[in-house]
């Protein structure tokens, strides 16, 4: 961005948003399979709509998992437990259509079967990682607080503080920047699905008091901050009844809220051999450690692949002018300390574990969870040593 003073907006959605229901189903199936078969190839897509969950994809595995049961238990855990919502775990129809992974793809991924000996990338493509020092978790402030709102909406719904809430919901946070640094919260937008017999005034007041005020530090909010709560006046029909949900439709909320770049590939339902997911996690790991090391205030890492080839075809580092050393020097350090070969990324980040369902809502990045190994900052000292800072 050329402007130094500007507004920037990011959004998040709750676990009951139809697209996120689909993501969680896809990743729940992946978790169940990877628990039994570490070598499985999974590409699992989900569609949810009124009274129906449809799962299709390409899965090659030696294990057997009860996909309909996984679908229903995931929906139940989210909170769709009443047929009046138009989508209910116990009564919705479940349809599956699963094929095996194409052998033409498999021979490029499986070690020793294609043109190259090493495990190759599962597809061509470009992936990005991003980090900045705006928040304690090295995420941009707008998406950081947007996720905190949606997590809080789910929390107060599930613990009974706001019993009138239903699972679907969205948030949007606009941050005012001054000289490229966050200054204040300009606008907060919340859409929260609710029971039909609740007044608008109660919904608005309750969300401001029990969600917004519990999420934002008072120094970021002022008398000019604008609130838009359920700004149509009513949000009763929601979830898969209100909108058809599909896996992979929330890739910006999944990543950095529109800051930085995105290669276009989604994450959910994909096993770790898919570089859309694994290389994006690795690029975040690299970017976060660079910023945590103090080498730059903001950094973006791009990596790209050819299908069946282990080594990336390109690696790019951009510090947006904030680097303490030149970007080409940072790239040299990255090449020395990190490997972007699929097998090495999977090993370093320990991705052959059933950890993916919890990545499927509230962001894949900026989470303080030990299972999110790509969020560790354990490479800070080696980076500092090579950077000479």
From Swiss-Prot:
ATP binds at residues 17, 168-170, 234-235, 243, 249-250, 270. Its EC number is 2.5.1.6. PROSITE patterns: ADOMET_SYNTHASE_1, ADOMET_SYNTHASE_2. It comes from Syntrophobacter fumaroxidans (strain DSM 10017 / MPOB). It catalyses: L-methionine + ATP + H2O = S-adenosyl-L-methionine + phosphate + diphosphate. PANTHER family: S-ADENOSYLMETHIONINE SYNTHETASE. Binds 2 divalent ions per subunit. Pathway: Amino-acid biosynthesis; S-adenosyl-L-methionine biosynthesis; S-adenosyl-L-methionine from L-methionine: step 1/1. Keywords: ATP-binding, Cytoplasm, Magnesium, Metal-binding, Nucleotide-binding, One-carbon metabolism, Potassium, Transferase. This is S-adenosylmethionine synthase.
């Amino acid at each position: 961005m050329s402007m130094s003073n500007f507004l920037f907006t990011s959004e998040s959605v709750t676990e009951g948003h139809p697209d996120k229901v689909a993501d969680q189903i896809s990743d729940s199936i992946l978790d169940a399979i990877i628990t039994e078969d570490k070598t499985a190839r999974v590409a699992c897509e989900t569609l949810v709509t009124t009274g129906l969950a449809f799962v299709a994809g390409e899965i090659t595995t030696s294990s057997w998992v009860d996909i309909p049961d996984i679908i229903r238990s995931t929906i139940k855990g989210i909170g769709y437990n009443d047929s009046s919502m138009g989508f209910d775990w116990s009564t919705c129809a479940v349809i599956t259509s699963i094929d095996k992974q194409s052998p033409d793809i498999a021979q490029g991924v499986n070690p020793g079967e294609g043109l190259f000996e090493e495990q190759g990338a599962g597809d061509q493509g470009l992936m990005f990682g991003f980090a900045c020092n705006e928040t304690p978790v090295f995420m941009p402030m707008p998406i950081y607080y947007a996720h905190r709102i949606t997590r809080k909406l789910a929390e107060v719904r599930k613990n009974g503080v706001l019993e009138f809430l239903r699972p679907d919901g969205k948030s949007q946070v606009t941050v005012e920047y001054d000289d490229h640094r966050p200054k204040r919260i300009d606008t907060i937008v919340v859409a929260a699905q609710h029971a039909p017999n609740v007044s608008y005034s109660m919904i608005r007041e309750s969300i401001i008091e029990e969600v917004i005020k519990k999420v934002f530090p008072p120094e970021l909010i002022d008398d000019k901050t604008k609130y838009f709560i359920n700004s149509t006046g009513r949000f009763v029909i929601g979830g898969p009844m209100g909108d058809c949900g599909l896996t992979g439709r929330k890739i910006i909320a999944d990543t950095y809220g529109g800051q930085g770049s995105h290669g276009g590939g989604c994450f959910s339902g994909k096993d770790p051999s898919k570089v859309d997911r694994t290389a994006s996690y690795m690029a975040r790991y690299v970017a976060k450690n660079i910023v945590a090391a103090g080498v730059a205030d903001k950094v973006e890492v791009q990596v790209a692949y050819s299908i069946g080839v282990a080594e990336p075809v390109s690696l790019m580092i951009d510090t947006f002018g904030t680097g303490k050393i030149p970007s080409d020097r940072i790239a040299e350090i990255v090449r020395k300390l990190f490997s972007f070969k699929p097998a090495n990324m999977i090993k370093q980040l320990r991705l052959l574990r059933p950890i993916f369902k919890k990545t499927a809502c509230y962001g894949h990045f900026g989470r303080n969870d030990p299972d999110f190994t790509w969020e560790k900052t354990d490479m800070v000292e080696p980076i500092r040593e090579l950077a000479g800072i």
